[in-house]
Amino acid sequence: MKIDKKKLIAGILTLVIAACSYVVTEYLREDTPAVSGDGLTVQYIDVGQADCALLQCDGQFMLIDGGNRDDSQLVVSFLEQQGVKELTAVVCSHAHEDHVGGLPAVLAVYPTKAVYAPTKTYSSSIFDKFVYYTDQQGLEITIPAPGDRFSLGQAEVTVLGPVKSYAETNDTSIVLRVTYGETSFLFTGDMETDAENDMLDYWEGKVDWKTDVLKVGHHCSNSSTSYRLLNEVNPTYGVISLGKDNSYGHPHKEPMSRLNQAGVTILRTDELGTIQAVSDGKEVTLTWQNQSAVPENAEPAAQVFIGNKNSKVFHAPDCKNLPSEKNAVEFASYQEAVDAGYSPCGSCLG
């Protein structure tokens, strides 16, 4: 039997390429590891109109953002109360003061193994102090790339964004997915809708986005937390970090409506104080500081999206670009519209 070497080589190359493609697709979808120990604790610290979260797993600690400059003593004292002696990682999601503000004070007090930020330079005195105290620890700021991973005890931290360079500082926000056993937490900083969409496009088919607890983006501004992101993430709980009666009008009614439509239980630091989530690897239990307040337990609302039969674009029911009645088709969910081959409207659905 004569063997065609060219066809044989071509066949082998096809198999190799297919195998590589499978690896790229599956490398963020590995089997869930079994976990043991005291679990993962995530504390969304009440720092007013700002962000700050402390994560603890197997005696290791990670701080994501540090509130405003005026929150420095509050954050340092909170870490002291939690028994922090050393930080495995400090993450500055992006360079705005309401995220980096308290981090210089933290780095001045606590030995830290790694510092992450989306940039090493930014035109502000508080960011300069952040860089200074990082240098004082003998560290360099690490700018993580999409897909980078590190461990916090038995918890796995994966960097999912940003996936491009952006001029808008909010869009440079580092996005982290923290998994512990079968549970997961998502932190999106202040990333806005266009960058969210870029990230979802980048990871399409490669990431299981399902999340137990979503730290709602940009203090629940209408610039973030799009229908598309919520459809992918499908969170059980949404934590909003914001200040009472803040000047920005947060939380905005539009993302609150989207969260309610998705059936997300909403927990707000301006109402509940510091919020604590504890995962045992199977389930997440939430408690909060202000015991007299209760979270907003949303029931999935009746969702209707309007599709344009001609353009194959679907819209939120309050969109200004709705089709005529004879050219309209209704969908009961975002996913139903996507499955029918329709694309989301760029204006109302981001």
Question: What residue spans do the PLM features occupy?
Answer:
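Non-globular, low-confidence helical/coil segments that flank catalytic cores
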Residues: 2-301, 321, 327, 332, ...
